[in-house]
């Protein structure tokens, strides 16, 4: 009976969640609502949250899916308190399986690893063991990583390379024949305001408030760290966004562009071969990490990022005619990728991958332009054709 209720609830929730394509539309997701929907209040779910937050009530909330909240409002009354508790217990156990005993981990992998993700084997034990330190104490681990693997010279080179790529993107904006001067002006303002984070944060996170007790279980200590993180986030309510805060650890092999703060971040983890090598030529570095940086910069002007202004606010700064021209060009790119057969009978979803496809093309173009404008390109182009360069 419990399992049937859990599966039934998941199926109902699944049918009320926006499709992935719709979730790519910022204006469709950002809906300011007042108060908490009635059913949540009727089940006394709001009070403990409000008490923990230290505020009397939610005056406004940015709801990513109002449709989902409306569904919850109508669905909760159909469940008993016992069914709601069973669902929440299952959710906690499922989320905690990674720090529980092997039988919980194995059961979780059978479902979410094999069935949902198609994996054949779980990650090795050492890698799973590093998950919690990397997430809960990410910057502490990152500080150790940076001291050993990321010299200051790497950061200096990268900051210069990023500025060259910023100039190159500015050139491409100027060269757009379909964009008006008014919209180009705002695009340049946004590009100039772009915050760049390279390698590691200037100020490391202070974890001294996390209380680790060796006498307690692994699970209890993980929960204690989670409580600290939650309270740390509560303290940010009602305060200006700290744009110096990092949202990716230094040892992470990845990068990001955040439209809501208009920033790009390249942790030390990705600034190593094959992406970056201080001893390599400019041609190699522009062709590797340069393309990645150009990709992330372009996200600021793709089908999602273009809806945010220089400050990260959701504002339409495009002239209507420019927006219409952009959409027509984007539709053509979407159609092109819809025809890509990724497996027999399986085609790419050009609408869902549109942002990445735009960023990939932008990254290549920007990196090439930046390299050709660099001093090193003159000598390199003597050895290769213009296409090879």
List where the protein language model places each region:
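Conserved small/polar residues in nucleotide/adenosyl-binding loops
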Residues: 1-2, 6-16, 384-389
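Noncatalytic, helix-rich "gating/capping" subdomain that lines the substrate-entry/channel surface
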Residues: 9, 14-160, 164
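Zinc-dependent metallohydrolase catalytic domains
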Residues: 24, 159-290, 299-386
């Amino acid at each position: 009976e419990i399992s049937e209720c859990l599966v039934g609830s998941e199926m109902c929730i699944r049918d009320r969640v926006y499709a992935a394509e719709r979730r790519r539309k910022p204006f469709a997701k950002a809906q300011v609502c007042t108060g908490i929907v009635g059913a949540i209040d009727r089940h006394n779910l709001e009070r403990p949250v409000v008490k923990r937050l230290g505020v009397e009530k939610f005056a406004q909330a940015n709801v990513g899916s109002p449709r989902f909240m409306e569904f919850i409002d109508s669905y909760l009354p159909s469940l008993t308190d016992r069914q709601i508790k069973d669902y929440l217990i299952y959710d906690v156990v499922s989320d905690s399986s990674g720090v529980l005993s092997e039988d919980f981990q194995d059961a979780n992998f059978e479902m979410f690893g094999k069935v949902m993700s198609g994996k054949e084997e779980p990650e090795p034990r050492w890698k799973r063991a590093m998950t919690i330190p990397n997430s809960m104490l990410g910057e502490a681990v990152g500080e150790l990583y940076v001291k050993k693997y990321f010299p200051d010279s790497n950061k200096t080179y990268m900051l210069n390379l990023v500025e060259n790529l910023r100039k190159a993107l500015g050139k491409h904006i100027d060269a757009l024949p379909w964009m008006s001067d008014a919209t180009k002006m705002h695009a340049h303002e946004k590009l100039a305001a772009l915050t760049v984070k390279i390698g590691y944060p200037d100020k490391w996170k202070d974890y001294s408030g996390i209380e680790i007790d060796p006498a307690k279980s692994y699970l209890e200590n993980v929960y204690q760290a989670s409580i600290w993180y939650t309270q740390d986030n509560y303290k940010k309510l009602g305060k200006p966004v700290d744009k110096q805060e990092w949202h990716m650890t230094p040892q992470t092999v990845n990068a990001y562009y955040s439209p809501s703060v208009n920033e790009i971040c390249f942790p030390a983890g990705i600034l190593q071969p094959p992406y970056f090598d201080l001893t390599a030529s400019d041609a190699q570095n522009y062709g590797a990490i340069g393309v990645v940086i150009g990709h992330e910069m372009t996200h600021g002007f793709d089908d999602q990022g273009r809806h945010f202004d220089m400050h990260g606010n959701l504002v339409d700064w495009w002239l209507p005619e420019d927006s219409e021209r952009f959409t027509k060009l984007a539709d053509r790119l979407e159609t092109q990728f819809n025809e890509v057969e990724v497996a027999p009978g399986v085609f790419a979803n050009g609408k869902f991958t549109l942002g990445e496809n735009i960023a990939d093309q932008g990254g290549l173009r920007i990196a090439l332009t930046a390299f050709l404008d660099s001093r090193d390109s003159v000598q390199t182009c003597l050895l290769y054709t213009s296409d090879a360069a």
